[in-house]
Each structure stands twice: as structure tokens, then as C-alpha cells.
Amino acid sequence: MTLYLTSDLHVDHYAENRTEISYFIERYLPSSDVLCVAGDTADNPKIFVDFYRLASQKYRQIFVTFGNHDLTVRHDDYFMQNPFTETDKKLSWIKEKLSELPNVTLLDGTTAKIGKLTIGGCMGFNDFSVGSRTWPHPKEWLLNQWQHWYDNVHWRYMDNNPGAILKDELRKLRNVISQKPDIVMTHFIPTAFGIPRKYEDEYSNAFFYFNADEYLAKMKNKSVWLAGHTHDTGKKVLSAGRNKITLLLNPVGYPMETKGRYSLKDRATAAMIKL
């Protein structure tokens, strides 16, 4: 059995109809038995669902979590093709449509099994613990900056209260980790790794990462944690006691980020698990 691990598909930046979605699948997603997507399938809910309707014909099983772009809704002059003005209603509709696809599993604080593997996940959320390495800012300042950040501007979710959102996502994550999964998927990144040097001094790092030491310490040996959100690749093996845990970032990203910047073949090799 083979599993391909990825994130940040942003399909609606590549495709507007089913024909273009099919091309995207063949162009950017290699063949495997299982596809794992750690968030940011699409802002557009129709394209989100159509993508999985088509991808489910290629893969034996698909596991997916939500990402920050999946939570966006129509407001003012933004996302006018999105019929939803409340994030909860959008997510409920997506869940309902995905439930019609027997080989697509949405992980939202839940786990599922395929063969002997247990896979679990949720979106996760940032905790403002990471920022600029050279010019650190207090949490209060970062919270204020978050008011102008993409998520707060385009979500209508849990009153856009970052403390409440974090608490809810960590509750989901605790449930996932308690099941001792072989693969964990979150969109937000569980520790500050994979930050490109050019971004090390960006305060916006605070909106990508969270401190997951408590959860990493409880993971089983040779497990994998797939994350996304950043559009840069990364791989790191952590030691948690006697256990080794692989952290993996393998996004698709936006069209201008894919052209000539990386080899699809190399990506497939780096993020393909063979059992």
C-alpha cells in the first residue's frame, strides 16, 4: 500500500470546472493507494467538493482535514461565488457532501483506520508562540496584528475569537493523539520548523505554528505528522524519548509557486510512504 501526503492544494487557483480539476489531479497528484491532504483544498466550497468527487475515482481512500482557506466565506466584495456567509454552515455543507463519498474521510478531531494504519487529524490553530526570531513581539501585539490577518478578515467562525478557536482545536487534537495514530494531520504546524530563512524575521510566523510538545511526546515510534499552511517543503525527525517522529511539509501551493520551483517527481518521492 502506498500513501501520498500533501497539503495546500488551492485547487480554485488552478481550476474553475471539472475538466480543469481533472487536469490538476493528473498534473500535481501522483498515483498512490491513499491520498492525505492536510488542509486548504479550496476557498470555493463547490470546487472543494467537486475535487474530492473526482479524486475519489483515482484513490482507494482519501483523508482530509480543513485548512484556514477552507473556512473563508462571502463578505463585502470577497468570495462572491461562495454562497455561505457563516463558516459553520459552509463546513457543515462540505461535511454533508463528503459523507456521500464512501472512500473520502474528513478528519476533524477524529481518527480512521485503513488496514493496520490509524490516521487522525484536525485543522489545528496557531497559539502566537512563534514570531520573529530577531524582533520578538509580545502576544498582545501579535493578537492585535491578527485582527488584520487573512483568517480574521475572511472567517466568520466562533466569533473569530482566537483563544476559543485554539481551545477547540486542541480539544480535537487531544482526542486524536489519545488514539495513538500512525499518521497525524493538521493544517497548522506543530512546532517551529521549516521556516525559510527569508521569513525568519516575519512576525506573521505567529499565525502559522503552535507548540505541540505535549502531543508529540505522546506519539508512537515511527509515526508521521503531516502539516501544511506554509507553502515551503520541510522534513524533520524529532526524538520524543525513545520514539522518532517525522514532521513533514509537502504543499502544492499557488500556481506562481509551482512553476519551475520544484520537481513534481522529487515531491512524490519525498512524501510517498510505502508499506
Regions found by a protein language model. Give the residues of each.
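N-terminal active-site segment of His-dependent metallophosphoesterases
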Residues: 1-64, 70-76, 274
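Active-site environment of divalent metal-dependent phosphoester hydrolases
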Residues: 10-16, 42-47, 69-79, 111-114, ...
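Short, flexible/disordered intra-domain loops and linkers
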Residues: 74-88, 197-204, 260-263
